[in-house]
From Swiss-Prot:
Lineage: Bacteria, Pseudomonadati, Spirochaetota, Spirochaetia, Spirochaetales
The protein's role, per its UniProt record: Confers DNA tethering and processivity to DNA polymerases and other proteins. Acts as a clamp, forming a ring around DNA (a reaction catalyzed by the clamp-loading complex) which diffuses in an ATP-independent manner freely and bidirectionally along dsDNA. Initially characterized for its ability to contact the catalytic subunit of DNA polymerase III (Pol III), a complex, multichain enzyme responsible for most of the replicative synthesis in bacteria; Pol III exhibits 3'-5' exonuclease proofreading activity.
Domain of life: Bacteria
tRNA-binding is among the record's keywords: no
Designated name of the protein: Beta sliding clamp
Cellular localisation: Cytoplasm
Any one GO CC term of the record: cytoplasm
Record text on subunit structure and interactions: Forms a ring-shaped head-to-tail homodimer around DNA which binds and tethers DNA polymerases and other proteins to the DNA. The DNA replisome complex has a single clamp-loading complex (3 tau and 1 each of delta, delta', psi and chi subunits) which binds 3 Pol III cores (1 core on the leading strand and 2 on the lagging strand) each with a beta sliding clamp dimer. Additional proteins in the replisome are other copies of gamma, psi and chi, Ssb, DNA helicase and RNA primase.
Keywords carried by this UniProt record: Cytoplasm, DNA replication, DNA-binding, DNA-directed DNA polymerase, Nucleotidyltransferase, Transferase
Record keyword Cytoplasm present: yes
PANTHER family hit by this protein: BETA SLIDING CLAMP (PTHR30478:SF0), DNA POLYMERASE III SUBUNIT BETA (PTHR30478)
Organism whose genome encodes this protein: Treponema pallidum (strain Nichols)
InterPro entries in UniProt: DNA_clamp_sf, DNA_polIII_beta, DNA_polIII_beta_C, DNA_polIII_beta_cen, DNA_polIII_beta_N
Length: 371
């Protein structure tokens, strides 16, 4: 194998391969990236046995061939080269990396590609075309609410469902819930929901372009994303996702509206002095005014306390709500509206956070005790 290629184009794709590979030590074939030169293309593939990535880039193929090489060191070597083009040559069991007309040479040990896994087949799945902007929005609104508790693996991913041509994504950690629904560009067959790991969603999200669409395909064991010459697959998480519909309030009796940026900036300041273990912040709402405080009125804080008032649209009775400020801050960062609305019936029961005007997503937040 011998190829001549653009450094940045090659580096971009092997860096994605590096993200996929979990094991950064050169101990197995799964620490390697596959390079296959054929025709006028170089195919690049990487896997950690659960997530698989594949793409092809145009190169000048001087001699066809296939090999695998330790991905982490390959990225480091290519990054260090000073030229716009690089030459890769397979010599017996070594990949020689050199820039044209430069007295620089790196040799990396290779492993045979014979035992390297193929890209998983997606036969028998259901498919839906989704605009890339919608998919990015769905990922951004859900990944932060996924549970990190490994003993509850069934909520360690985002629940994805197709209903009447729409795609619905839901995530929860047991104390909050994120919900977003988008219309697909094509309608799939009947389908029961699956749980998609956050790792594949994060990698795909970083590769999405502003325009175009993504073909999302789901089989009994895998999820696939196809777009812009990229192919991604991931093993699904097994288990029964909780019945999230039971925790979504049918109706909230009271609500208040507040500027999104104003609330976000106030949270950032007041949270500097909240108790770091619980992240609890206190919100006092009264007519026309919202007060954020790092402590309750009856508490003493060893470090100190912070308080900030901002205007809000509210006409009900005065109430105090305590909650984990991160559960409010993280959705505010991904909303793009000027205002948000917080709906509630009782300060001790679930709150609903929405954009104003109302869109196709909302967040449910369980409050904390005020004392």
């Amino acid at each position: 194998m011998k190829i001549l290629c653009e450094k940045e184009a090659f580096l971009k794709e092997i860096s994605t391969a590096q993200e996929v590979i979990s094991n950064k030590k050169n101990t197995s074939i799964f620490s390697n990236v596959l390079l296959a030169a054929q025709g006028a293309l170089l195919t690049i593939r990487a896997t950690d046995t659960k997530v698989t990535f594949e793409t092809s880039i145009p190169v000048n193929v001087l001699a066809e061939g296939t090999t695998t090489v330790f991905c982490d060191k390959l990225v480091n070597v290519v990054s260090a080269l000073p030229t716009k083009e690089i030459e890769l040559t397979l010599c017996e069991e070594q990949l020689v990396i050199t820039p044209p007309n430069k007295k620089i040479s790196f040799q990396l040990r290779t492993l045979s590609h014979e035992s390297f896994p193929c890209f998983p087949q997606n036969e028998g799945g259901v498919s839906l075309a989704v605009p890339t902007s919608d998919l990015r929005n769905m990922i951004n609104h859900t990944v932060f609410a996924v549970s990190e508790d490994s003993t509850r693996h069934f909520i360690n991913g985002v629940h994805v469902d197709f209903q009447y041509g729409n795609i619905i994504c839901v995530s929860t950690d047991g104390k909050r819930l994120a919900y977003i629904e988008k219309k697909g560009e094509s309608s799939p067959q009947s389908f029961s929901g699956v749980i998609v790991p956050t790792k594949i969603l994060g990698i795909v999200n970083r590769k999405l372009t502003p325009e175009g669409s993504v073909t999302l395909c789901i089989t009994s064991q895998h999820v696939y994303f196809f777009f812009g010459g990229y192919k991604f697959s991931s093993v699904l998480i097994e288990g029964q996702f909780p019945n999230y519909k039971r925790v979504i309030p049918d109706h909230q009796e009271r609500s208040f509206c507040v500027g999104r940026v104003e609330l976000m900036e106030a949270l950032k300041r007041v949270s500097l002095l909240v108790e770091q273990k619980s992240h609890r912040i206190f919100i006092t709402i009264q007519q026309g005014l919202l007060t954020l405080s790092s402590k309750a009125h009856t508490q003493e804080n060893e470090i100190g306390d912070a308080q900030e008032e901002i205007a809000c649209a509210y006409t009900g009775e005065s109430e105090v709500i305590a909650l984990n400020y991160l559960y409010l801050e993280e959705p505010l960062k991904v909303f793009t509206s000027k205002e948000v609305q917080v709906e509630f019936t009782d300060p001790a029961k679930a709150l609903t956070l929405r954009a104003v005007p109302n869109t196709d997503c909302f967040h449910i937040i369980m409050p904390m005790q005020t004392e």
